Amino acid sequence: MRQMALLPAIDHHAILPSIMNNIKRIVLTGGPCAGKTTALVRVIEHFSNLGFKVFTLPEVPTMFTQAGMNYLTQNPDFFYEGEKATLEIQLALEDKFLRMAEACNEPAVIVCDRGAMDISAYMQPEMWERITRDVGTTTQQLRDERYDAVLHLVSAADGAEQFYTTSNNASRNEPASEEGLRIARLLDKKVIEAWTGHGHLRVINNHEDFEAKIRRVIKEITNVLGLPQPIEEERKYIVEVEGEMPDCIESDITQTYLVADPGVEVRLRRRDWSGKVVNVHTTKKRVSGHEEIITERQVPNALYESLMQQADPYRQTIRKNRKSFIWKGQYFELDTYLNLPEPLTILETKGITEDEDVRFPPFIRVLADITCNKKYYNYNLALRR
């Protein structure tokens, strides 16, 4: 089995001190039978070897189920109290471990086996609003402000059905049958929707090689921690849409490039969907010919407007409509550009390995493969002509 290589030869001792006072809290979530348990073990091993103290918080609903909670109860009062207690313990665990991490003498990272918004996927929105109000918090605080990154592992029920099983989690309620697969896919979608809007939500595809899925998790956490990593190109295609698309998450995006030093790319992105707005500031810095450091942070509206004053005068703001969807276990983003001289629609894959085939949906007609074609980088599309 091919193992995840350690990071390229870099001076970790020079980098780790800057991470000491910037503890990251990361959610590892996903649909049923997505591979979270294995991923957590590998995350501990990999980042411990790099000098990190890795705290992995257990899945709270599983703890509650083992202690006697019945999430399928028909008693609404019992269900409400159980879900409210689940959220309270989830937040308390995270806060206590953050205090512990701050007291460590080495850099630390907190990885949560599911996070607060996962709880919302298993109830009606009205009950979730009541619970958050009674706990003294809001959806915006829990989804947008609490965690540095959310990594969603797609359920094996979507694209890797041959590996779907319930034997590794006795508390799992969806059976390993056609109906169970349907329920698992539905839960997978509901969890993604619950986290949609977080500035660093990443969907980790299913792969023919499960090891590739684990490598993707480690790569994304490496990115969140601000450690150098090899530069990789996601596959991109100019496409036309033919026929009806499946359920997708639709959003409008404005992307502005700011004035930056040579070798540094600074981007300000605003994403608007269903009346909600999230702003993300991203910096990409080359540290060698084949390595880069990417840092992302969510910014409030006031800071967004202030940073817009630093817009690169030689580049226009890119405006596009994005439809995000999963097809046969693979995650896609379909961007339709709205303010370019010529119509342009680009389909981008996420996390598909070089030796893996892209499973194009039947409603997509590929016109050209533009992977690695710098002409179609957003940074270059934004150039004023």
Predicted regions and their residues:
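Hydrophobic anchor at the beta1->P-loop junction of P-loop NTPases
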Residues: 28
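Conserved lysine of the Walker
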Residues: 36
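Hydrophobic positions on the alpha1 helix immediately C-terminal to the Walker A/P-loop
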Residues: 39
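Conserved substrate/cofactor phosphate-moiety recognition/catalytic segment
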Residues: 44-89
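Conserved nucleotide-sensing/catalytic segment adjacent to the nucleotide-binding pocket
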Residues: 70-110, 115-116, 121, 125-126
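Phosphate-end processing signature that detects enzymes handling 5′-triphosphorylated RNA
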Residues: 145, 203-206, 211-212, 218-385
